């Protein structure tokens, strides 16, 4: 697999888009994932992303989208988020990337007012619609497994059940190693995602709260997970996810530390290449 970086690491530290893309290549990454809202960026920014990545010979693999409104109980909110997610898919196509990383969100009101089964059905219906659009563009959607108690997809079993029920060839899973650890999902559970996973995120945490730290800064035992991921035979990328560097002025060192640590892990797991 290739080693990538989600470019939000740079943006959240106030670095300009093209600078971040150039630095990603300079550090040694094979690929890049883009965190950008197509409803917020203009045509110039879209072209800048595409052209700078081409110039650096840095393929874009994924575009990240958080769309919690897809499972809102208000149809008008759902319609907006469907159209917004379609705009994301169009951006994925425009950037010549492979997939849309999609975060669905959580059950509302502690699962006590709106029946959980209703939100589950809503998610299935709307994800199928989006998967149809993705398939028409030759793309795929990678659903994020979130580690929070009320997250719709917060375990491998829930992810597998959702994908099986959706039964759509363009709807797949993303594996986030830190999220698996936080959700108390063991490495062997990853085997259930054979043929269902197309993308991977990697970061560390303290074992208690969501952290997105450079590997080695927390408590995650990565190698057992990486060996199971290798066995899946995914033709894709493992992207480092770093959020909110504690010292924004030293974000380059933060990213280099994450790159070096992850590169060593992938080499030990015989996974990069």
Protein language model annotation of sequence segments:
Residues 1-27, 153-172, 178-273:
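Histidine-acidic metal/acid-base catalytic patches
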Residues 9-11, 36-38, 66-69, 104-108, ...:
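Active-site-proximal loop/turn and secondary-structure-junction residues that shape catalytic pockets
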Residues 11, 16, 55, 71-172, ...:
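Active-site acidic/histidine proton-transfer and metal-coordination neighborhood
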Residues 21-26, 43-62, 89-96, 128-136, ...:
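Acidic (Asp/Glu)-rich catalytic clusters
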Residues 33, 62, 101, 142, ...:
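Conserved beta-strand positions in the central sheet of alpha/beta enzyme cores
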Residues 33-54, 107-114, 210:
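Glycine-rich, proline-tolerant flexible connector loops at the mouths of alpha/beta enzymes
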Residues 41-43, 69-73, 248:
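Short active-site-adjacent helix-start/loop capping segments
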Residues 42-47, 78-80, 249-250:
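Metal-dependent catalytic neighborhoods of phosphoester/phosphodiester hydrolases
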């Amino acid at each position: 697999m290739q080693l990538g970086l989600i470019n939000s690491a740079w943006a959240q530290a106030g670095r300009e888009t093209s600078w971040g893309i150039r630095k990603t290549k300079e550090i040694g990454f094979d690929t890049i994932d883009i965190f950008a809202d197509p409803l917020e960026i203009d045509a110039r920014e879209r072209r800048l992303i595409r052209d700078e990545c081409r110039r650096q010979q840095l393929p874009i693999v994924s575009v990240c989208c958080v769309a919690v409104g897809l499972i809102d109980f208000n149809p008008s909110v759902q319609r907006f988020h469907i159209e917004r997610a379609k705009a994301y898919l169009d951006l994925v196509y425009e950037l010549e990337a492979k997939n849309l990383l999609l975060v669905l969100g959580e059950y509302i009101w502690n699962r006590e007012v709106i029946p959980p089964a209703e939100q589950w059905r809503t998610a299935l219906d709307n994800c199928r619609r989006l998967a149809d659009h993705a398939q028409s563009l030759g793309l795929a959607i990678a659903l994020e497994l979130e580690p929070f108690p009320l997250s719709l997809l917060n375990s491998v079993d829930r992810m597998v059940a959702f994908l099986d029920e959706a039964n759509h060839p363009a709807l797949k899973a993303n594996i986030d190693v830190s999220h698996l650890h936080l959700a108390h999902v063991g490495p062997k559970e990853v085997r259930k995602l054979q043929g269902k996973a197309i993308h991977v995120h990697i970061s560390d945490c303290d074992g208690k709260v969501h952290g997105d730290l450079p590997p080695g800064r927390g408590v995650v035992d990565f190698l057992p997970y990486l060996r199971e991921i290798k066995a899946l035979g995914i033709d894709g990328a493992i992207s480092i996810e770093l959020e909110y560097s504690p010292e924004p002025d030293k974000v380059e060192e933060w990213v280099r530390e994450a790159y070096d640590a992850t590169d060593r892990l992938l080499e030990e797991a015989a996974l990069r290449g």
